[in-house]
């Protein structure tokens, strides 16, 4: 009796990581199917530009890789879902004075939810991506573990996994360094082996989110006042969507000293300006929580926490609140804690969970 190969659908962006992920899984004996999520909108600038995972060139790169690996390739239409679950909330968050992370929302709602359900609907056992993270089962629970390549670790953007999603997801790149992934791609003759990493927001071609929001919702972007913490007017801003906490460049203010964005008030349409010391805080409130290592936080625990993708984990205590949110208290002050960003909790290399920063205390 022959054993049936397990089927895996690999989400392919046209980049080197997902391409090598497909190769590694085929080598491990899986029946591999390549698929690219078509998420670009009716926007020729985005559709035709080079590089990003939304572009037509990325689809062609993924198709060529699948031809090389001799695996089937499909393009799946996620346009409506991407607009509803990623783009529209992204715009609204900025209008509401927060700074969102669209990659986290895309992972949560599309890649590891809708794509997984579509895959299971056609009899596929697993989905896989080129993310730098590891999934391991310990006792009766799946764990999300930091990548072996600390510089490229992507667990910050992956904390929303459910146990069922982890059970049906493969991330083969987590066992390798980025340099080794590129070497493998070159060794097997993949043209994407030296393709540049995509670092900008995939649906914004010039990385100018303010201009993007102005074009999408012109009536929602209004100029207002820069004020100090006492409410004194220091100048005019061009719309709160252009600013984020801790920002110094591009303010267009001349006040004789270095100043930074310390708060954004959508109710009054004001951007609060202050000294650098004003953007260092130790406490925050987070909501929209997801925990991986347990179902619910019952008591306060000590963790390491990251407040943005590029931050180093810092020692903190998370305290459950009666309303279902948590208070996070850092041992040391953190620079530019920002509403709308995620705070992610770690125990060493293990991801405990995370949530959205809703308030800074």
From Swiss-Prot:
InterPro entries hit by this protein: MnmA-like, MnmA-like_C, MnmA-like_central, MnmA-like_central_sf, Rossmann-like_a/b/a_fold
* Region described as Interaction with tRNA: spans on this chain: 152-154, 308-309
MF-aspect GO terms: ATP binding; tRNA binding; tRNA-uridine 2-sulfurtransferase activity
What are the subcellular locations of this protein?
Answer: Cytoplasm
Q: Which CDD domains match?
A: MnmA_TRMU-like
**A Gene Ontology term for the protein's cellular component:** cytoplasm
Major subcellular location class: cytoplasm
In chain numbering, the residues marked as site (Interaction with tRNA) are 131, 341
Q: Which Pfam families match?
A: tRNA_Me_trans, tRNA_Me_trans_C, tRNA_Me_trans_M
Look up keyword DNA repair and say if it applies: no
Reactions listed under catalytic activity: S-sulfanyl-L-cysteinyl-[protein] + uridine(34) in tRNA + AH2 + ATP = 2-thiouridine(34) in tRNA + L-cysteinyl-[protein] + A + AMP + diphosphate + H(+)
| Disulfide partners | 106-202
- Keyword annotations: ATP-binding, Cytoplasm, Disulfide bond, Nucleotide-binding, RNA-binding, Transferase, tRNA processing, tRNA-binding
Binding locations of ATP = 11-18, 37, 130
Q: Where is the active site?
A: 106 (nucleophile), 202 (cysteine persulfide intermediate)
Q: Which EC class is the enzyme in? A: transferase
A GO BP term here is: tRNA wobble position uridine thiolation
EC no. given is 2.8.1.13
Family statement = Belongs to the MnmA/TRMU family.
Which NCBIfam families does the UniProt record give? PRK00143.1, trmU
The job of this chain, per UniProt, is described as:
Catalyzes the 2-thiolation of uridine at the wobble position (U34) of tRNA, leading to the formation of s(2)U34.
Would you tell me the protein name for this molecule?
A: tRNA-specific 2-thiouridylase MnmA
